[in-house]
């Protein structure tokens, strides 16, 4: 479960130069960068946690998720988890050299796993649709969304009731992702690959939709 409240501060966005040579070099891409747009404008991203970097098709732009990873009091005396922007993941964009750093999403929910779409939009995973897991009522659900490349026009692509992860674009232009689907089946075996059109239409499972029972698997 990719919740910013579970993240430990540390790390960064790095590039490994000459990775297969005799002297590979690791470089902090954002070492001299400050956020140019968004709630964290004017600040460096040097004290939080990074997740799911994504390179554009032309190799010029990078998307990633970042949380400030501030301290969080579990449950806060309530029956459901409630986040604040300071310990939620948000999506950022920068140029391949680390310049042009801007914040695209914000709010009291986690946004992560950004993915460039061929039509210029960005697919990502978000808790914005609302709802909680059936087997963990206090845990917010995150599913497929998309937005314009400047963070505007956010659209929900999936209404599924449990988590989805890792969107990517297949060679035929379809959006491929994983989904936790345990309706009428065991809880922990159905994290399989699904596909849909980039606008969310026609979600389908590649594997069929009736996996074996957990007890019948060799592990």
Predicted regions and their residues:
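Residue-level marker for isolated small/hydroxyl-bearing positions within beta-strands
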Residues: 16, 65, 94, 123-125, ...
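A conserved hydrophobic secondary-structure block that centers on an alpha-helix together
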Residues: 59-65, 69-71, 86-106, 110-111
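WD40 beta-propeller repeat blades
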Residues: 168-174, 179-190, 195-219
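Multi-bladed beta-propeller domains
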Residues: 20-48, 95-110, 147-162, 197-217
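Beta-propeller domains
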Residues: 1-43, 68-87, 92-96
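Short, conserved, GDST-rich strand-edge loop motifs in beta-rich repeat architectures
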Residues: 1-8, 65-88, 124-140, 177-191
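Conserved beta-propeller blade repeats
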Residues: 46-55, 61, 109-122, 161-176, ...
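Beta-propeller blade signature
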Residues: 9-18, 82-97, 139-151, 190-201
